[in-house]
Amino acid sequence: DAEEIVAGKKTLLQISSENKLKLAAEFFYDEKIIRQFGTVSFLVSDLPLQDEEMLNKVLNIPELFYTVLTPKDESKKRLSQLSKAGKRYALLLDDNITELNFKLSSRYSDDKIKKSIKEIVGTFYNAVFFIIDDRSDLFESEKFPLIQSELLKRGIKLTLSSKLETLTSSKVNAEDKFQDFMLTVKKNDEKVLVVSANDYLTISELIPSYRKIGYKFIYPGDIIIKR
């Protein structure tokens, strides 16, 4: 049996066997020791919006994260649920927006673009920041400067998807991929990791272990907003 007693800057470790004390050691906290691990935050994508049970499992994970939504009615219907669960979100703009009231297209007139932006911002006004897929046709189009201008004048923070880390894995190796990622996080790093809801359910169980050894986990907004 092992017993750890913490008192101020001193820790007493006692190891016993068969009710006999085998080892007793004192450890003292050294204020000169500096944290050697970096900071990580999570953006959880691919929410199971049509699966109530799975969605609740994700929202009930007791860790710090934002969800990632795309402009569509299914996302709109879940906004109050996210709010009640105390979860905030970022909004992704890419080529996959299909619903006409939210759609952004290089073929649209400036007025139609402005109307769509107004609808998006009016519906998802609680988004902490917007993400633009900078590998999308939308980003490369001649309409993007207008989209960017309309967002910035509303005080919306816009970040590029390429500035974010992405955990690409299968269900089998999510833990291994996450552990590989954590090895890349150095002491001065502040990384935002995009991870699918399914994978986050798996890797969230590993987070407390990393926190114990010195890694810091915070909300993505604390990194993105100050950039």
Feature-to-residue mapping (PLM):
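Second-shell loop/turn segments in exported
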Residues: L43, L47, L100-S109, F129-E142, ...
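Structural preference for beta-strand elements that scaffold enzyme active sites
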Residues: T39-S41, L64-V68, G86-A90, N126-I131, ...
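CE4/NodB-like, metal-dependent polysaccharide N-deacetylase domain
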Residues: D110-D134, D180-V194
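Non-catalytic propeptide/linker segments at domain boundaries
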Residues: D1-S41
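His/Asp/Glu-enriched short active-site or ligand-binding loop at hydrolase and phosphoryl-transfer sites
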Residues: E150-D176, F217-R227
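Active-site beta->alpha N-cap acidic-glycine motif
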Residues: F27-F102
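Long, folded non-catalytic interaction modules
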Residues: T70, L92-K118, D134-L138, P145, ...
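C-terminal domain-boundary segment and adjacent tail
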Residues: D199-R227
